[in-house]
Amino acid sequence: MWYYGRDPDFDRQINLPTGRCGLATSRDGIAWQAQTGPLTMGAVLEPHPDEKRFDSSHVGVSDVHERDGLYWMWYFGGSQITQTIGPYTVRGFDLRPGLAISRDGLHWSRVEGPYRGALLDVGAPGEFDMLMCGWPQVLQDATGWKMYYHTLEPRRGFLVGLAVSEDGLNWTRHGLVLEPGAAGGFDEQGAATRQVIRHGSDYLMFYEGVTKSGYRSIGLARSTDGVHWVREPGREPDGSIFAHAPRGSGRWDAFAIGTPSLVPMDDGSWRMYYIGSNESNQHAAGGEMALRHRIGLAVSDGPDLTRWRRWGE
């Protein structure tokens, strides 16, 4: 398992839970042991030392594939640029996707892209993804390669975009593919991190829906081509397929669950690893830095990908 995190002294003007990337291993997918990487504090990927690079302030991993004896890591990073977004002055919010290659999962070499090292640039002024293209997730199908990412448009919320490629290295922006949901819904403020999988003849997108007040749960959308998507109503009271723990419960994932990562099991069921965070009275003032992020696990009800329960419940 590759993940991102940060130490207490990491630049707090970067108001995201990213920083450096690490590796953990497990025999059963339940009990995990962090591995010591070759970089700062045991990381396996860290910000680039060249301040002109797209990934010089922080990095985060969002997808890893094994192909032809190599690990391909699609990651994202932010630069040294400082912006004012809403009530926050933040550094490195101009996220762009990058690629790194490894033989052992510990030692990584960046693949240089055309946009200060990135594979894809942010959109031009006025376009929906002009602020960022973050958390890339890649899928290969009969038509080539698809890269799903999300962005933030302050007046509309979080939006999912798509880029396409013939070789997984050279990418062309396709456009917006998923907008915010209906007013009052669990995804009224948009769709953020996500994973797209092939399931039979369909594409399924498990996405992090954001409410108007910032709470987050997992939703599901379906597509026949990976481009045009239709939301599927979930069984949770808020319309999601897997909801954050009840508000005020004090549980570790009572504020947000997101960044879904699905793994098929031999018995036909699925596991979904996710990042959760707690409620905090300081969130409005401190943003992401007021929250504690951890990794959790949910399991499906057999092959039914619309029914989920937390591991051990």
What is each residue range found by the language model?
Residues M1-E313:
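Carbohydrate-active catalytic/glycan-binding domains of CAZyme proteins
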